[in-house]
Amino acid sequence: MNKLYIGNLNESVTPADLEKVFAEHKISYSGQFLVKSGYAFVDCPDEHWAMKAIETFSGKVELQGKRLEIEHSVPKKQRSRKIQIRNIPPQLRWEVLDSLLAQYGTVENCEQVNTESETAVVNVTYSNREQTRQAIMKLNGHQLENHALKVSYIPDEQIAQGPENGRRGGFGSRGQPRQGSPVAAGAPAKQQQVDIPLRLLVPTQYVGAIIGKEGATIRNITKQTQSKIDVHRKENAGAAEKAISVHSTPEGCSSACKMILEIMHKEAKDTKTADEVPLKILAHNNFVGRLIGKEGRNLKKVEQDTETKITISSLQDLTLYNPERTITVKGAIENCCRAEQEIMKKVREAYENDVAAMSLQSHLIPGLNLAAVGLFPASSSAVPPPPSSVTGAAPYSSFMQAPEQEMVQVFIPAQAVGAIIGKKGQHIKQLSRFASASIKIAPPETPDSKVRMVIITGPPEAQFKAQGRIYGKLKEENFFGPKEEVKLETHIRVPASAAGRVIGKGGKTVNELQNLTAAEVVVPRDQTPDENDQVIVKIIGHFYASQMAQRKIRDILAQVKQQHQKGQSNQAQARRK
């Protein structure tokens, strides 16, 4: 993706003219400019310089009276399903962008690209070429909060690799290497190890003191704590605060945190710029609910144990560019450092639980990408890579059996129905289209019902997407308090004959299920099976707990079905003999 196409050139433009323009704007390039009639090509050293050239020149710089148009050079064979969208308003919410993208087809992946510009850039993969073509036609130049979007193709690596399934691809061995190699059916996939960093937010005026003369101070911190420290100075130019990422063991992160906090306190005292310098920790929004705990109990305990005052930034501050919440800790240095240890312990636990759930989803739902679902924005360094990039799993192919349709009932607060439906039904339609699921809201059982049933019908991936968005919407619209985690009751139906297998002998299976998933699982006794001879299993918990419980129960049902079919097959063979 480092080769650029330069368009809208006068026919008299020479390579020397382009070399001069690139030199004037200090844009690095490699090789020579290949100039054609009205356009040219050039290679950049890496993706960083390619993006910088696009942001610097495209539609902004004139050459011989014409504005340059620069974008990634993409061969026609690779103009498939992937596009890049630039000039996105930085304050835009993920949901708004998702809704816009979903108007043109099924988004398989949406990941943010790190750039030095103030606006955001995302790479988007649609499910087929026609959807991508429509998106480019409609979105290029589309006005979004006074920003004109710029859209172009980017190379589709899968096309570059050539078709799979034993067929020879046109690119042969020159195709780009795969991110993950295919995994044999049933073979355990090796999970890529990703450590969660400690992310701090520090006042810009103290960054120089933290780095030190010629980097001496930060080198000393790195050496003493055995850590890797990144100071994100170039991001958000002019901002009052800068982010620092510390990569190390939990102990190493805590030691580095203490040293950085001590430097800031000393600098504040010497320069008399502040009476108090609080510790500010950045944590991805997905983990904050579990840090807070039910009715804020976890957070209160940390405050009491460490003698600190802790506040967390509002959900309203989250944007496309900023999926993290700011946790502010006030108190003595020692106490703040103890609080950091407790906070990051909770965050790491939440992260590990989510990784386990993601790993489970990657095996049960091939091709699932959590960035596309919108639960884990891919830009976050605190989020593991999508399972599909680790395992190399491919989406459902034509030779595979289509995923089985499932019906799930999710119970939401009655007052949240309007938010889920949206104005003139717009939100529920977009949600249904995004998840590729049927979503209906059942009438209230009584006029004063406090909950309403949402009926979702679709395959496993559709269930994951739809339920995830519903959980997210309820939190976003403040139907649950800022210190309260979203926990919903979900019903799935199982054959009455298999209910015993879900419960297990003496309740062993259901107890193991609850311990494993952290969800409450109830199979009500004395149920009368419905007309399809099915009974209800109730699941209560936060999103990942509920999803994991649903998948485990489906797994049990699949085993029961397989054993039943095997028994029937054996009986048939015995009769033939």
Curated annotation (Swiss-Prot):
The annotated subunit structure for this chain is: Can form homodimers and heterodimers with IGF2BP1 and IGF2BP3. Component of the coding region determinant (CRD)-mediated complex, composed of DHX9, HNRNPU, IGF2BP1, SYNCRIP and YBX1. During HCV infection, identified in a HCV IRES-mediated translation complex, at least composed of EIF3C, IGF2BP1, RPS3 and HCV RNA-replicon. Interacts (via the KH domains) with HIV-1 GAG (via the second zinc finger motif of NC). Associates (via the RRM domains and KH domains) with HIV-1 particles.
The uppermost taxa in this organism's lineage are:
Eukaryota, Metazoa, Chordata, Craniata, Vertebrata
| InterPro entries with a match to the protein in the record | IGF2BP1_RRM1, IGF2BP1_RRM2, KH_dom, KH_dom_type_1, KH_dom_type_1_sf, Nucleotide-bd_a/b_plait_sf, RBD_domain_sf, RRM_dom
Q: What is this protein called?
A: Insulin-like growth factor 2 mRNA-binding protein 1
Query: Is Manganese given among the entry's keywords?
Result: no
Q: Where does the KH domain lie?
A: 195-260, 276-343, 405-470, 487-553
Effect listed in the UniProt record for changing K213E: Partial reduction in interaction with m6A-modified mRNA
Q: Tell whether Nucleus is among the UniProt keywords.
A: yes
